[in-house]
A protein has these predicted regions:
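Catalytic glycan-binding domains that act on GlcNAc-containing polysaccharides
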Residues: 1-115
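Low-complexity, Gly/Ser/Thr/Pro-rich intrinsically disordered linker/tail segments
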Residues: 117-164
């Protein structure tokens, strides 16, 4: 589940590199999972929901792991193949796990390294010093801890008995 902040909820045409709209989908992903206009919040949300369900299922089939909140975030961030590679090969260098995916093989080593290091928290960069040292296990643990922390904060903020 993805929770949007109030600031994000109104940035329908937001772009981050090649990712567009409310749920930051690429044009390819939107064409595959949705229809209509990528910047239309309803169309973007429907495509994202279909993408999240489909990729969580593929991840579970591949890894035999139930997609937790943190795994779902990892799937959204790294793609289902990237997330599956990270989870199933925790001792491998993380960028090499990305290069083991279809997209990684297509885009190459430089892209794989960027996909990891640009999504690594500063504190973890300080500990590991280099993308060439960061393991998939450490990368997964970093996001698990971050998502679990945010989920706990959100859960505490929602009144008991609420439907949120």
């Amino acid at each position: 589940m993805l929770v949007l902040s109030p600031q994000e909820a109104f940035q329908f045409e937001r772009r981050t590199g090649s990712y567009i709209g409310l749920f930051q989908l690429s044009k390819y992903e939107f064409a595959k999972y949705g229809s209509g206009e990528i910047t239309n919040p309803r169309d973007n949300a429907i495509a994202a929901a279909y993408k999240f369900v489909t990729e969580a299922t593929l991840f579970e089939w591949d890894t035999h792991e139930e997609p937790t909140f943190s795994y779902r975030y990892l799937i959204h961030q790294q793609g289902w193949q990237g997330a599956a590679e990270h989870v199933s090969q925790p001792d491998r260098i993380a960028w090499k796990s990305m290069c083991a995916t279809d997209e990684g093989r297509e885009k190459g080593e430089k892209w794989c390294k960027r996909a990891i290091w640009q999504n690594t928290l500063p504190a973890i960069k300080h500990v590991w010093k280099s993308v060439d040292k960061l393991t998939s296990g450490a990368f997964v643990d970093m996001w698990r801890e971050r998502v679990d922390h945010l989920h706990a904060r959100y859960s505490e903020a929602v009144p008991k008995g609420s439907n949120h």
